[in-house]
UniProtKB/Swiss-Prot annotation:
InterPro entries (UniProt xref): RNaseH-like_sf, RNaseH_sf, X-over_junc_endoDNase_Mg_BS, X-over_junc_endoDNase_RuvC
Signal sequence, start to end: none
GO molecular function: crossover junction DNA endonuclease activity; DNA binding; magnesium ion binding
GO BP terms in the entry: DNA recombination; DNA repair
Native source species: Salmonella paratyphi B (strain ATCC BAA-1250 / SPB7)
Family: Belongs to the RuvC family.
Protein name (record): Crossover junction endodeoxyribonuclease RuvC
Length: 173
């Protein structure tokens, strides 16, 4: 059993999603958004750090998965996004959580089956995969999708390792 915290970073809204994985079974534990209503960036970063730390304390995840930085049209926005990611990662590292990063395209490909999927498609598939009564808010859905991606990637990596081990054992006999 593993608990995975997914984070969709943003300097104004940071989405989070928490799921439990037992084998191939995924269970929704919680999701939401850390909203920073202050104007100055240092105060927003402090709120993100505190919010992520609180979520980690509440859910006690085993893994921390976060979206990688993408190239934004606006350099200032990209820098702020990078800083928001940074404080979220520091919150995880301070709690000794292993950190995994996934590209947005990989997350969409894993959850929807199309790397260029729309936000509404991600919301719908997250709702379906986690058997939720309604679509989660967009940023929370993205965070849940990141957590789901981590489950799929780690499950596939484990299966590949087992296959290689079995193959090696077969050669030794």
């Amino acid at each position: 059993m593993s608990i995975i915290l997914g984070i969709d970073p943003g300097s104004r809204i940071t989405g989070y999603g928490v799921i439990r994985q037992v084998g191939r079974q995924l269970t929704y534990l919680g999701s939401g958004c850390i909203r920073t209503k202050v104007d100055d960036l240092p105060s927003r970063l402090k709120l993100i750090y505190a919010g992520v730390t609180e979520i980690i304390t509440q859910f006690q995840p085993d893994y921390f998965a976060i979206e990688q930085v993408f190239m934004a049209k606006n350099a200032d926005s990209a820098l702020k996004l990078g800083q928001a990611r940074g404080v979220a990662i520091v919150a995880a590292v301070n709690q000794e959580l292993p950190v995994f990063e996934y590209a947005a395209r990989q997350v969409k490909q894993t959850v929807v089956g199309i790397g260029s999927a729309e936000k509404s498609q991600v919301q719908h598939m997250v709702r379906t995969l986690l058997k939720l009564p309604a679509n989660p808010q967009a940023d929370a859905a993205d965070a849940l999708a990141i957590a789901i991606t981590h489950c799929h990637v780690s499950q596939n990596a484990m299966q590949m390792s087992e296959s290689r081990l079995n193959l090696a054992r077969g050669r030794m006999r």
